[in-house]
């Protein structure tokens, strides 16, 4: 698990924002 904002998705150790 990654510490990302609720609206973000964690993938490959990074956080991506769902546009």
Curated annotation (Swiss-Prot):
<keyword id="KW-1204">Blood coagulation cascade activating toxin</keyword>
<comment type="subunit">
    <text>Heterotrimer; disulfide-linked. The heterotrimer consists of 1 heavy chain (a metalloproteinase) and 2 light chains: LC1 and LC2.</text>
</comment>
<keyword id="KW-1015">Disulfide bond</keyword>
<keyword id="KW-0325">Glycoprotein</keyword>
<dbReference type="GO" id="GO:0090729">
    <property type="term" value="F:toxin activity"/>
</dbReference>
<keyword id="KW-0106">Calcium</keyword>
<keyword id="KW-0800">Toxin</keyword>
<comment type="similarity">
    <text>Belongs to the snaclec family.</text>
</comment>
<dbReference type="GO" id="GO:0046872">
    <property type="term" value="F:metal ion binding"/>
</dbReference>
<feature type="disulfide bond">
    <location>
        <begin position="4"/>
        <end position="15"/>
    </location>
</feature>
<keyword id="KW-0964">Secreted</keyword>
<protein>
    <recommendedName>
        <fullName>Snaclec factor X-activator 2 light chain 1</fullName>
    </recommendedName>
</protein>
<keyword id="KW-0479">Metal-binding</keyword>
<feature type="domain" description="C-type lectin">
    <location>
        <begin position="11"/>
        <end position="19"/>
    </location>
</feature>
<comment type="function">
    <text>Regulatory subunit of the blood coagulation factor X-activating enzyme. Activates coagulation factor X (F10) in a calcium-dependent manner by cleaving the Arg-Ile bond at position 234. Weakly hydrolyzes insulin B chain, fibrinogen and some components of the extracellular matrix in vitro, but does not activate prothrombin or plasminogen.</text>
</comment>
<keyword id="KW-1199">Hemostasis impairing toxin</keyword>
<dbReference type="GO" id="GO:0005576">
    <property type="term" value="C:extracellular region"/>
</dbReference>
């Amino acid at each position: 698990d990654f510490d990302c904002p609720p609206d973000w998705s964690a993938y490959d150790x990074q956080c991506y924002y769902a546009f």
